């Protein structure tokens, strides 16, 4: 019989039916104007592919910050974080409190570390007089590329973390490569850097091996801000206000199209695996430029040539774990150790794995954030 040759999968059928019912319900809510969405959000919802409408609705409700919106999202969208439509199936093991509570460094620990490691750590300015600034650039919507669902969670999370660490955060969204470069130059020229002790630059978008994509990017007409350009904008020649101060660059973006996992045998013999020729650093150039480019450290969400993954209803795995590690360990660990803990959280490989990567590190001392001081 036909039904024996093609047995139904009842759970799959029920899941699909549930999605259809939910989408129809959301369409009625939007059409009846019960939730009073902005006109641009309505248009975005109506123009979206049917399979994407639920995620467009989530983003629109997140902007409202209303009690009704919160109840709707909690009721309909509380699902397993590892099952989101082609996104990475990575285990989110960190407890919720670690994402919301920043552990503070006690005055005694602050005094001890400053006394014992005076020559080894970057000096921290007094909280009352310093003017720390941070810049977040996030591209979510693109003319030719897919929408980055869940990116709003990354903005909210990183902004909250940096504010808790004492930074005044500037957020810019939906920029072309030229627009990103212009915003960075304006940020680098801020007078507040003179009385600051450090800065954070957070870049979140689609990406390529050598740069971060602007909103107009396509294969035919690239719109990419080269990573080299960022270093040039903030180096000691062009940004004297941050000279000899830590400049931390966080990048959430793909750096190629390969997945980050491979299969190996449980054996001590060398394994054959897919490889690529990475560009070689030129030692002479590094020495020549060391006095110009110094006190940087970049932390990328993945290795060169590989993908980076994002949960449509919770944000990117990299940013989520980064925030968690900062909130738990910034009270006692310097920056490099915090980054190492983020990498360790990705150490167990799974399908669609990624490995965050520290790059272009020219810090000459340990950078402690000393939250609470």
Swiss-Prot record:
The modification (Microbial infection) ADP-riboxanated arginine is found at residue 310. The record marks 285-286 as: Cleavage. The keyword Membrane applies. Changing residue 54 to E: Complete loss of LPS-binding, LPS-induced oligomerization, and LPS-induced pyroptosis. It catalyses: Strict requirement for Asp at the P1 position and has a preferred cleavage sequence of (Ile/Leu/Val/Phe)-Gly-His-Asp-|-. InterPro entries: CARD, Caspase-like_dom_sf, Caspase_cys_AS, Caspase_his_AS, DEATH-like_dom_sf, Pept_C14, Pept_C14_caspase, Pept_C14_p10. One of its GO terms (biological process) is non-canonical inflammasome complex assembly. Residues 1-80, 267-285 form a propeptide. Changing residue 38 to E: No effect on LPS-binding, LPS-induced oligomerization, and LPS-induced pyroptosis. Residues 1-59 are annotated as: Required for LPS-binding. Residues 1-91 form the CARD domain. Activated by homooligomerization induced by direct binding to cytosolic LPS, in a TLR4-independent manner. In addition to LPS, CASP4/CASP11 may also be activated by oxidized phospholipid 1-palmitoyl-2-arachidonoyl- sn-glycero-3-phosphorylcholine, an oxidized phospholipid (oxPAPC), in dendritic cells, promoting adaptive immunity. The role of oxPAPC is however unclear and another report suggests that oxPAPC competes with LPS-binding and inhibits the non-canonical inflammasome in macrophages. Changing residue 19 to E: Severely attenuated LPS-binding, LPS-induced oligomerization and activation, and LPS-induced pyroptosis. GO terms for cellular component: canonical inflammasome complex; cytoplasm; cytosol; endoplasmic reticulum membrane; extracellular region; mitochondrion; non-canonical inflammasome complex. Induction: Up-regulated by LPS and E.coli. In LPS-induced lung inflammation, markedly up-regulated after 6 hours of treatment and decreases at 24 hours. The induction is dependent upon DDIT3/CHOP-mediated ER stress (at protein level). In the spleen and in bone marrow-derived macrophages, up-regulated by poly(I:C), a synthetic analog of double-stranded RNA (at protein level). Also induced by IFNG and interferon-alpha. Up-regulated by R848, a TLR7 synthetic activator, and Pam3CysK4, a synthetic activator of TLR1/TLR2. Belongs to the peptidase C14A family. This is Caspase-4. It comes from Mus musculus. The lineage of its organism: Eukaryota, Metazoa, Chordata, Craniata, Vertebrata. The gene is Casp4.
